[in-house]
């Protein structure tokens, strides 16, 4: 009888060095690390959601095609329902893109940017080709065009507004890349509600364009994991081949649809976030030695005179959690989500303490 079992020996060799993704959980801190909506969920919309789901039979599987939600999204985006695909968060859709078009191939991506593209690419055995951003974190359009045209590159990715830098890429520049390549061009617009111009008007002209969106940021549904994708039907037909059956549960579908029917309170919250973003940027920039970068998202990237790890640890000790993004192109940088006025005030106060200067 065989008694020795080694799971690691059976796992894919190319994944042995991959570290599981872990999000820190500190329930007793001011949480400014995940770019969440700080104002919580509008009570009146929550009441509408609970009323909607109260009549549902949870013993039945959800609508696999999420038809009613796609109809609601069509009204919001101006895109036909057949050109919309929903997922269990945008993460699932990113992985589906990599599995469908990238396995055994390469993808080009403007860096620094959202780290999950690299992780999902690796899971799908799709090699990453990094295209460093220019000064001010602008996309190097000519370099992206060259990378997208390299042998084996089947996907090109641009996040706008970009996480973690906060800057947006004009649609005109993305159109230059679309014109130059037959590869899939993924435009991640997770933060579109906070700034920048959308590439949705380009969809009808470029069959290789894919746009990703999420309910996690502007619409305060991070806990329910709802993302969606806009693309031509031929692209979606291919993506559906790898989609998990019943990938978006009935509660999440209903909640997202109710959100689309009740946009005014979310727009008010977005307005408050934008106002706080400007105030936070001004106060960060006023701290000696701190460089804050302009943002069109719901977070701000900043560079400190101290090592980022020390600043991160010092803030955490004082009850404030931010994101340490120190790395290539982001030396001594951290990212802070725009919180409520009180959260932002506390963050500035504690950052001043960590840096040894009065805030």
UniProtKB/Swiss-Prot annotation:
Pfam families: Aminotran_1_2 (PF00155). CDD domains: AAT_like. It is an enzyme of class 2 (transferase). One of its GO terms (biological process) is L-histidine biosynthetic process. GO terms for molecular function: histidinol-phosphate transaminase activity; pyridoxal phosphate binding. InterPro entries: Aminotrans_II_pyridoxalP_BS, Aminotransferase_I/II_large, HisP_aminotrans, PyrdxlP-dep_Trfase, PyrdxlP-dep_Trfase_major, PyrdxlP-dep_Trfase_small. Coiled coil: none annotated. Its cofactor is pyridoxal 5'-phosphate. It comes from the Bacteria. Its EC number is 2.6.1.9. Keywords: Amino-acid biosynthesis, Aminotransferase, Histidine biosynthesis, Pyridoxal phosphate, Transferase. Pathway: Amino-acid biosynthesis; L-histidine biosynthesis; L-histidine from 5-phospho-alpha-D-ribose 1-diphosphate: step 7/9. The modification N6-(pyridoxal phosphate)lysine is found at residue 217. Gene3D superfamilies: Aspartate Aminotransferase, domain 1 (3.90.1150.10), Type I PLP-dependent aspartate aminotransferase-like (Major domain) (3.40.640.10). It catalyses: L-histidinol phosphate + 2-oxoglutarate = 3-(imidazol-4-yl)-2-oxopropyl phosphate + L-glutamate. Homodimer. NCBIfam families: hisC (TIGR01141). Belongs to the class-II pyridoxal-phosphate-dependent aminotransferase family. Histidinol-phosphate aminotransferase subfamily. This is Histidinol-phosphate aminotransferase. It comes from Pelotomaculum thermopropionicum (strain DSM 13744 / JCM 10971 / SI). The gene is hisC.
